[in-house]
Amino acid sequence: MAESGDSQQEIARPILALTMGDPCGVGPEIVAVSATRAETLASCRPIVVGSPEILREAAALWRVATQVVAFDSMDEAVRQASSDDPTVRPSSERILCVRTGPPFAEDSIRTGVLPAGKIDARGGDAAFCSVCTAAQAAIDGLVAGLVTAPLHKEAFHLAGHLYPGHTELLAQRCGVADFAMMLYLGHDETVRAPHGLAVVHVTLHTAMRNVVREMTQSAICEKTALVDHFMRRMGCERPRIALCAFNCHNGEGGLFGDEEQTTIRPAVERCVTQGLDATGPLSVDTIFVHARDGLYDAVVAMYHDQGHIALKLIGMHRAVNITLGLPIIRTSVAHGTAFDLAWRGPASGVRISSMLEAIRCATKLARTK
């Protein structure tokens, strides 16, 4: 018997866990607004993970007329999100929220109990608890993936959670050693490659003095293979991958460093023998111009800022942060907690475009498992 249109629609709308991030930052605001947007509800069934009280305060600040329904367990929330009854599922008038982290009273931000736009250990602990709960739900198969709002690394550490960031925490929780951070921009008038542009990083949250040591041939090949796999999931049959040089002017034949000759070029050759369409190393001052114009589908950056700065200049407000190599789907906004803008409401200039793109990307990945 053929499935009804409604049943097919539900299959196409995966359940996603949206973490609230650090409550002292913009996370609760962008989540409260994004979870009730029509484009979100048309593509997925969101469950927010964090403090219901903080979420209600954020919704009120942004004049989002919605009810926040609190749950003490993910199982409960998933059952309601999966219901055939439209009066209990997530909607523009109803946000499902699983309670995690330290308890906060109503109006904790307004009354100053929790400092808006400030580093606070309670904010770091709240972010940690929300992402751990969401990740476990994804590992257990309760949700199709998680979309994370930003945390603050110093607050994270003040709370005793000594991880460099989301990426490393999730890799540890999932028990994987081969993983990578990637930024992604979908196709539009600024990114001409038909399946968008991905930038993966060989090294990540490390001091510049450590990059050369960590930038091994094996690491380069692993990250290149990961971004190739991602772009294939996005519909690109044979991704064209460009690898960045490490030194200025591509090392100028060894005059400005020999990492291009001793490490990067041999890694590119190994990638080619493995069947990848890889080229490089290429000078960084032009590689991203060519990638933006559609010559490449993905770029492999050797270190954090080499990739982040270039991609964010192309499209910061719609970029998505994706963790590659995990057995679960994790996407995120590509910006931080924005303490300077947090809890000032719509007039602050806070944008939700990156969160909406992160939700859209997680939904697409969930459909291509």
What are these regions (language model features)?
Residues 2-259, 265-369:
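Anion-binding alpha/beta catalytic cores of soluble intermediary-metabolism enzymes, centered on
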